[in-house]
Amino acid sequence: MRLLITGGAGFIGSAYTKKLIAQGDEVIVYDALTYAGNLDNLKEVEENHSYKFIHGNVCDLKKLDETIDGCDGVVHFAAESHVDRSIADPSPFIETNCTGTANLCELVLKNKIEKYVHISTDEVYGSIGNKIGEGSFTEEDPLRPSSPYSATKAAADLIALSYHHTHGLPVSIIRPSNNYGPNQFPEKIIPLFITNLLEGKPVPLYGDGLNIRDWCNVEDTCEAIDTVLKKGEKGCVYNAGAGNEKTNLELAEKLIELCDADKSLIQKTTDRAGHDRRYSINSNLIHQLGWHPECDFEKGLEKTVEWYKQNRQWWEPLRDSSQ
């Protein structure tokens, strides 16, 4: 299968690209290489004859059209994805996440692409409950995004679904929970905490630290995406969570333990504006396709910490350039 992977130099996109190539698929990565896109994530496949990289933006309709020609399928990762950055300046989120998605929908139709998997997020549902176990969103629940980031992702979902209902766009949408693993840009909470702790720096904890997230290992998420690509119904949405709900405080304390650091490094900070209390999704629909998360959270976290310990040359330049 010849697949176009937009945003394939990012965290999840690069992991999925490597999975596809290992499976024998032909992959074209199309990435704008903004601050979170990094070709070092793809070094192990850059000489593979089944891999090709195109430097381009999903808002560049002409270049995207030239790139998509001849592909069998598209997996659309390309997005601006950091909540705090969206609060500071929503403009690039609107452009990339909304206009970029509309461009891709047009070109999938024009080029008669067989399958289009759109990568969304559990954040489009908004917050649910205040404690672990207090309900979960299903795919039928209304979208109530809270941040400019999640609002643009919800808009992108609706754009893609509107193209399905109006034009028969062969799209399936997957809404994963929070991801973690190697090669994640160090502004995100887990790599931010790990890299700070490895350097003896404080870990900034918003508010009371009791906001809850469900954590899924990136390898499990890649398997979920592949399941939707191969088995997902057109016009359907699939939640993909792992059931590893943790408060941010619990997460910080576990990472302090794994990094052999001191709890005094936890530094409470002013809460994020509009901070969602808890995300939780019901993943029964994708379970019916045969996907179930396999990675134990604590073991996955240990492996992730070890990766950042062994790969300072990867994250130190990224962290320094983003400060």
Whereabouts are the PLM-identified features?
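A short, amphipathic alpha-helix embedded in the catalytic core of nucleotide-handling enzymes
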Residues: 20, 163, 192-196, 224-228
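Short beta-loop-alpha junction of Rossmann-like oxidoreductase domains
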Residues: 127-129, 182-184, 188, 285
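A conserved short alpha-helical segment within the catalytic HATPase_c
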Residues: 160, 190, 194, 252-256
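The catalytic Tyr-centered alpha-helix of NAD(P)H-dependent dehydrogenases
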Residues: 145-152, 176, 182, 186, ...
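N-terminal Rossmann-like NAD(P)+-binding domain of SDR-like oxidoreductases, especially those catalyzing
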Residues: 1-179, 310-323
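Residues that form or flank phosphate/diphosphate-binding pockets in enzymes
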Residues: 12, 37, 62, 184, ...
